């Protein structure tokens, strides 16, 4: 079984679902998502631990004239993210299958296309192929927002497209420049295969401006402040299943891109821009935290909490330390497992508050739906990184890596952890406790909500007990990924010592 089967299976299932009678389309797509999940589990089960290189490699020439390969592979950076993708898409499709959608064939087709694009981006081992899948992700979400969104969906779609296309333009320019400059440097033929590009060290000035091109694209997609101008309208207008997978896994493709592409290909630039990136992360952490704490819109609390959490993840990546990088990878998974059920819970609470997502219309749900409130409490505690949760381990590792790199930055970031506890508890207490809301109906958790939320909550609990599931698989590859940047940083410190300038030395593990 090859990775191509895993990548294109969701799209194939969505096309088969379109042939079904209309009442069966959603259930067929949902059951099909379990097949994709099973295939992903089979790859994870066969994944060899302690191996830093690629596994399950597919490598075929795609466009020979441009040196573009259809190269796929799994390693410690992407194997758990692939599994996360299939879990969250499956949960979202089951949530969707219990609802009526206009033009259901088109709706489930775009969901299948989105899952295939995300899986392709995670598995791509050719820079041009990664860019193709990265841009392909925009198409289904353009239609999911524009055709099935709510509120100001036209405005939301326009902003999403403009921001994403600008980011994609920068990424395309950076990718082309990387391939061309690498070819000029070696005097060989043009290639975009990542393993080949990593063998060549571009000039410092070239690395700097190409780094900025990729950084803009990834920071817009995640997004981090101040690149988040599309987020409020986009997240507010997306249908709940779409926003759950967008925040849960699509945003992770951008964070993953920093690890897969930026750090190994541009080590000098990664060190050169380390401090600006860390400062940007701090600004974004506090911006997301403050907005999440002050807004009365439950969906926006989750949206801006995602900005803060993704900023923590980026902080760990640019600590350029193994602990920070592993914490970032672990929290990519943790955040996906937390944010998707949070959006489902917001939708469930809104149904019980007369369709309103305003926190002022909620309250008292815990007294009438204690099981639903229990699920919400587990997710909220995971969000605030309660000791004992997998999120706590991830954030601890991020802060440890940041402390090893820049102590002052880690102290300021730690205060952001306290802010996360404040907005997570505020969301839970206001929506599920306090007074009884104006329109709260007496309804316990239903099958529609249970099939999407309960399995993810169980995974959260399993990872809390056994976080090594992800850590053991990622460690060898992660260390190899950040090694070029660490070597560059060490060379910079040596140069400063040779010049007689003081250098702050921090122990690294």
Predicted segments, located by residue:
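Membrane-interfacial loop-to-helix junctions in multi-pass inner-membrane proteins
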Residues: 19-36, 99-113, 128-131, 149-170, ...
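Alpha-helical multi-pass transmembrane bundles of energy-transducing inner-membrane proteins
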Residues: 110-113, 117-209, 220, 291-358
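Transmembrane helix-loop-helix hairpins at membrane boundaries of multipass inner-membrane proteins
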Residues: 2, 17-109, 184-199, 480, ...
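Predominantly late transmembrane helices and immediately cytosolic-facing juxtamembrane segments
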Residues: 225, 339-343, 409-443
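Juxtamembrane/interfacial segments at transmembrane-helix boundaries in multi-pass membrane proteins
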Residues: 48-69, 169-228, 233, 258-276, ...
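Structural signature of hydrophobic alpha-helical transmembrane segments
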Residues: 1-9, 74-85, 128-140, 207-220, ...
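Alpha-helical transmembrane segments of multipass membrane proteins
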Residues: 14-19, 41, 90-94, 116-120, ...
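Central hydrophobic cores of alpha-helical transmembrane segments in multi-pass inner-membrane proteins
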Residues: 2-19, 30-45, 82-96, 114-116, ...
């Amino acid at each position: 079984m090859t990775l191509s089967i895993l990548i294109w299976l969701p799209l194939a299932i969505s096309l088969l679902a379109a042939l079904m009678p209309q009442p069966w389309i959603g259930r067929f797509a949902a059951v099909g998502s379990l097949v994709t999940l099973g295939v992903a589990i089979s790859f994870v089960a066969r994944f060899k631990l302690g191996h830093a290189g690629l596994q399950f490699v597919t490598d075929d020439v795609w466009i020979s004239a441009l040196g573009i390969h259809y190269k796929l592979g799994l390693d410690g950076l992407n194997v758990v993210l692939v599994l996360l993708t299939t879990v969250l898409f499956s949960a979202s499709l089951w949530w969707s299958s219990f609802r009526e959608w206009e033009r259901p064939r088109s709706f489930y087709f775009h969901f299948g296309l989105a899952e295939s694009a995300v899986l392709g981006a995670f598995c791509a081992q050719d820079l041009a192929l990664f860019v193709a899948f990265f841009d392909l992700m925009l198409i289904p979400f353009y239609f999911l927002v524009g055709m099935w969104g709510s509120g100001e969906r036209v405005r939301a779609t326009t902003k999403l497209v403009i921001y994403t296309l600008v980011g994609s333009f920068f990424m395309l320019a950076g990718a082309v420049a990387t391939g061309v400059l690498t070819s000029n440097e070696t005097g060989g033929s043009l290639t975009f295969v990542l393993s080949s590009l990593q063998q060549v060290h571009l000039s410092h000035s070239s690395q700097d401006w190409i780094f900025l091109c990729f950084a803009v694209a990834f920071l817009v997609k995640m997004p981090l402040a101040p690149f988040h101008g599309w987020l409020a309208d986009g997240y507010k207008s997306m249908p709940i299943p779409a926003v759950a997978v967008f925040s849960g896994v699509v945003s992770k493709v951008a964070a993953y891109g920093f690890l897969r592409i930026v750090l190994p290909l541009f080590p000098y630039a990664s060190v050169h821009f380390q401090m600006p990136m860390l400062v940007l992360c701090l600004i974004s952490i506090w911006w997301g935290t403050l907005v999440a704490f002050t807004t009365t819109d439950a969906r926006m609390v989750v949206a801006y909490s995602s900005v803060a959490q993704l900023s923590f993840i980026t902080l760990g990546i640019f600590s350029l330390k193994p602990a920070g990088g592993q914490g970032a990878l672990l929290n990519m998974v943790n955040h996906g497992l937390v944010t998707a059920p949070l959006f489902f819970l917001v939708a469930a609470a809104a149904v019980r508050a007369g369709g309103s997502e305003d926190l002022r219309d909620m309250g008292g749900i815990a007294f009438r739906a204690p099981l639903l409130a229990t699920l919400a409490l587990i997710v909220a505690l995971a969000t605030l990184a309660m000791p004992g949760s997998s999120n706590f381990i991830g954030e601890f590792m991020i802060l440890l890596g940041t402390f090893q790199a820049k102590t002052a930055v880690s102290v300021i970031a730690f205060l952001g952890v306290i802010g996360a506890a404040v907005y997570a508890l505020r969301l839970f207490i206001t929506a599920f406790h306090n007074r009884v809301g104006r329109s709260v109906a007496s309804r316990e958790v239903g099958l529609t909500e249970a099939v999407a939320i309960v399995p993810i909550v169980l995974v959260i609990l399993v990872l809390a007990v056994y976080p090594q599931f992800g850590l053991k698989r990622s460690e060898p590859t992660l260390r190899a990924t950040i090694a070029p940047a660490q070597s560059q940083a060490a060379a910079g410190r040596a140069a400063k010592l040779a010049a007689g300038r003081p250098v702050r030395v921090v122990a690294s593990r």
